[in-house]
Amino acid sequence: VFEKESYRLLGAQIVGYDGVDKRIDVLATAIHAGLKATDLKDLDLAYAPPYSSAKDPVNMAGFMIDNISKGLKQWHLDDAAKLPMDGSVTLLDTRTVGEYSRGHIDGFKNIPVDELRERIGEIEAGKPVYVICQSGLRSYIATRILEGYGFEAYNFAGGFRFYDAVMNDRALIEKASLCGMDK
């Protein structure tokens, strides 16, 4: 939680199992030190490859907040029901064909992020593009690609897993893998 005007870090909440205590300690220290939420991306935190990634979830939260501070356009769960279905916007799902076939939001066209550059001509210029993926990473990458081609693109905050869990009252407590990819 951060103050909108100053980005001063005010609080944090984490849900999970392993490593939650470490990350809350880091965030509590950052709050005590008066860090801005955008400073979290620059923290140099120790890690061991078998237990964490090179960029800790605390760093990733900082990157997300930094993107917001720089004007990354997002859309949220409460916007989903209000998205125009009249063709005035493009609705894009960047997950794999397999992920899309297991469930998707009506009206969303499936172009996997790895095919986006080759299939960019399938997206009508001049229309805003609302993008979703499984967890948020691929849709973020897709919005950056689309912006590079001159599109006005909006990234869904949360991903289809979040959307599906809320809309269909499903539990999110399960083993998750990166970007919905099976290991």
Residue positions per predicted region:
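C-terminal catalytic lobe of FAD-dependent flavoproteins
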Residues: V1-L40
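Short hydrophobic-acidic sequence motifs that mark active-site Asp/Glu residues
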Residues: L9-G11, L91, N110
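Rhodanese-like catalytic fold shared by cysteine-dependent sulfurtransferases
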Residues: T38-V89, V97-P128, Q134-K183
